[in-house]
């Protein structure tokens, strides 16, 4: 991997991780279309660290409040809306964690292909359009219930299918349940913290148990670039989502998926 490839892939990871357009698709496509070699386990860990740091630092006040309330609910049996939301985020993490443990190898072998990415990019883009068009946009994240959180957790589990988009499918599910765009995005981003932590820890453990050589310069590039791009992306997405809606991302997904289908048909 060259420094240009590291910069480009980290930039892609940062910008696409929290937009409803699928980060996995954008990381798979350069190798499929440009013939780049796989970025490797160490680089995967690096960009996970960068994007996780971005969302934790951006939501640092909310994270501290939720963690404090969550610990208080365990230690002091104190329950409030913050502790309730924290427990619901934990609940929403369980389906994806179980799905990952059970089906990760199957997905890696059979679904990590450009054809699957093209199909899911278009299908889930159209689903996002339909749901956003018909959404009531009335609830905030503190009106979350355990049934709604579990529904969002199942949606997050589906995001393991390449091209689906974790933020895309969870925001789609939240809009379907009647949440505002801002609340849907905030809960989706907060949901990402435990699942990215689990995924990064799993990859880090695999890396520690392997004999893979580590290039600190490339890894530093991955962490820094993915952090900066993810932080910027979160900031502007939350500021603009209410006014612009989901249509720009729907159009992008349809164009990307259609272009990929044409490219595959010609090759």
Curated annotation (Swiss-Prot):
Any one Gene Ontology biological process term?
response to antibiotic
The catalysed reaction is: di-trans,octa-cis-undecaprenyl diphosphate + H2O = di-trans,octa-cis-undecaprenyl phosphate + phosphate + H(+)
Question: Which organism does this record belong to?
Answer: Aliivibrio fischeri (strain ATCC 700601 / ES114) (Vibrio fischeri)
Task: Answer yes or no on keyword Thylakoid.
Answer: no
Q: What is its EC number?
A: 3.6.1.27
Q: Where in the cell is it found?
A: Cell inner membrane
- InterPro entries attached here? UppP
Give a yes or no for keyword DNA-binding in this entry.
no
Q: Name one GO molecular function term.
A: undecaprenyl-diphosphatase activity
Q: Which UniProt keywords apply?
A: Antibiotic resistance, Cell inner membrane, Cell membrane, Cell shape, Cell wall biogenesis/degradation, Hydrolase, Membrane, Peptidoglycan synthesis, Transmembrane, Transmembrane helix
**Predominant subcellular localization, coarse grouping:** membrane
Q: What is this protein called?
A: Undecaprenyl-diphosphatase
Tell me which GO cellular component terms the UniProt record holds.
plasma membrane
């Amino acid at each position: 991997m060259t420094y240009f490839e590291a910069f480009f892939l980290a930039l892609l990871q940062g910008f696409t991780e929290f937009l409803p357009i699928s980060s996995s698709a954008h990381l798979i496509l350069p190798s499929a279309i440009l013939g780049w070699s796989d970025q490797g386990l160490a680089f995967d860990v690096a960009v996970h660290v960068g994007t996780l740091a971005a969302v934790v630092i951006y939501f640092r006040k909310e994270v501290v409040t939720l963690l404090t309330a969550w610990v208080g609910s365990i230690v002091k049996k104190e329950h409030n809306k913050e502790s309730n939301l924290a427990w619901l985020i934990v609940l929403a993490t369980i389906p994806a964690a179980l799905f990952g443990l059970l089906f990760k190898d199957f997905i890696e072998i059979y679904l990590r292909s450009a054809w699957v990415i093209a199909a899911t990019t278009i299908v889930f883009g159209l689903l996002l359009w339909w749901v956003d068009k018909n959404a009531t946009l009335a609830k905030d994240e503190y009106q979350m219930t355990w049934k709604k959180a579990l529904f969002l957790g199942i949606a997050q589990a589906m995001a393991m299918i390449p091209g689906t988009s974790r933020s895309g499918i969870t925001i789609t599910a939240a809009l379907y349940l009647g949440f505002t765009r801002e609340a849907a995005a905030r809960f989706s981003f907060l949901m990402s913290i435990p699942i990215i932590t689990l995924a990064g820890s799993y990859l880090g453990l695999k890396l520690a148990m392997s004999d893979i050589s580590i290039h600190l310069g490339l890894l530093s590039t991955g962490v820094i670039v993915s952090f900066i791009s993810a932080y910027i992306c979160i900031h502007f997405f939350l500021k603009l989502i209410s006014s612009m809606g989901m249509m720009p991302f729907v159009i992008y997904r349809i164009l990307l998926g259609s272009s990929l289908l044409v490219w595959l048909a010609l090759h």
